[in-house]
Regions:
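A glycine-centered loop/beta-turn motif at secondary-structure junctions
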Residues: 323-365
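RNA-binding accessory domains that recognize and position tRNA/RNA substrates
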Residues: 1-210, 214-215, 229-231, 341, ...
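Catalytic beta-strand/loop cores that center a nucleophilic Ser/Cys/Thr
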Residues: 287-329, 365
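Beta-strand-turn-beta hairpins that frame and shape the catalytic cleft
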Residues: 172-178, 285-288, 326-331
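Cysteine-nucleophile active-site neighborhood
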Residues: 214, 219, 224-301, 343-361
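Proline-centered loop/turn at the N-terminus of a beta-strand
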Residues: 110, 177, 247-249, 265, ...
């Protein structure tokens, strides 16, 4: 490996890691997190939930199979930055159309490779997620720390990634009309709904209950997304107004917002859950599901006791809440991603559950 480093990242605790720049050349302050997935870097880079975050990939080889046109989770990636051990700029894949570096450059996302990703990951695991600054090698540490301190923590992540006006994803022979609240929705969620006979109307995060009801939905979906759920309490208020009227299904941030709508509380995890192999127990069936996860916040289990929500899933690594349900209101949600691709398909049945609830609701209307 070369040793003429030209870029570095500086964490707010003063630690520095040197490497080589790739992608877009820019200095940027982000929150640093890590993901343990072996594959799926394209889906990670294009996941809106990583907005304002710099992701450390723990798997050492990244870029090997390039970028394909069909595997994006959003049209415009908004990840804050990417940190990898070894970057491969010569992909081998008959489907690839661009390199990872080209996609990062096109979307103004800085990357750095050649750093000790294991050491960084241990630091995040032991001390928690922190803010980080990616910059040139000759930037003084004191200047970098000053920039980190003076850069405000963003609270507009959802509004940054949500659509600005409604759009449609239709399928032939559809049976159900679903309105999806876009807090940073992944395209594979929409594909999963389309594949089950749903026409999907995607609306901005700040759409009113009255506007949603004008679409006469059979069900409402609250999407994943970035940031602190308490920054978008408007969506929780929306759930309060619509629960009991329509079946509602939420994923990730949507799960947290549904929980807030029922009076539960959320809190920030020390370093979050990000990877494709998190074991989750279904409390109704006793089965263990291997899940794909990407979140910094979780629902407080104690706060659920005073609500109408019942826990349905728990994480077997730390016993955090992974799913809740209010059968009376036909509302349920999970913290993880049942639509994950690439990733485990153990939880794809949750989309079928949503379909069945909508079917029963239409039959009993």
């Amino acid at each position: 490996m070369k040793n003429d480093f030209n870029r570095k990242i500086v964490l707010e605790d003063g630690s520095e890691y040197y490497g080589y720049g790739f992608g877009y050349h820019a200095d940027r302050v982000c929150e640093i997190v890590f993901n343990t997935s072996m594959v799926g870097y394209q889906e990670i880079v294009s996941d809106p939930s990583y907005t304002y975050q710099m992701v450390v990939m723990t798997y050492p080889l990244i870029g090997n199979y390039g970028i394909t046109d069909e595997d994006f989770e959003t049209k415009v990636p908004t990840i804050g930055g990417l940190v990898v051990r070894e970057y491969n700029d010569l992909p081998s894949n008959f489907r690839y159309t661009k390199t990872l570096s080209e996609i990062l450059e096109e979307n103004k996302i800085p990357g750095i490779w050649g750093v000790d990703t294991r050491k960084i990951t241990r630091s995040i695991r032991d001390l928690g997620s922190r803010r980080v600054y990616i910059t040139d090698i000759d930037t003084p540490k004191e200047e970098a720390l000053k920039i980190i301190k003076e850069t405000p923590v963003p609270t507009d992540a959802v509004s940054k990634v949500s659509c600005k006006k409604r759009w449609y994803s239709r399928t032939s022979n559809h049976k159900y009309n679903v309105v999806a609240i876009d807090c940073g929705i992944k395209l594979n969620i929409i594909r999963s709904l389309n594949a089950r006979g749903c026409n999907v109307t995607v609306v901005p995060w700040n759409t009113t209950a009255e506007e949603i009801e004008m679409h006469e939905p059979d069900g409402i979906f609250i999407s994943n997304g970035p940031g602190d759920p308490e920054d978008v309490m408007q969506v929780a208020e929306l759930v309060r107004k619509l629960k009991g009227k329509y079946p509602i299904f939420g994923i990730c941030l949507g799960h947290q917002l549904i929980s807030l709508a029922y009076g539960a509380k959320t809190y920030k995890l020390k370093f979050g859950h990000r990877g494709g192999n998190h074991p989750v127990k279904n409390l109704e069936t006793g089965k263990i599901e291997i899940t794909s996860q990407n979140h910094s916040y979780a629902v407080d289990s104690e706060s659920l006791k005073n609500t109408e929500l019942v826990p349905t899933h728990i994480n077997l690594l730390d016993n955090t809440i992974e799913g809740v349900e209010c059968k009376k209101d036909r509302v349920f949600s999970v913290q993880y991603h049942p639509e994950s691709a690439p990733g485990p398909q153990d939880s794809a049945y949750l989309f079928d559950k949503f379909i069945n609830i909508m079917k029963e609701s239409k039959e009993n209307a």
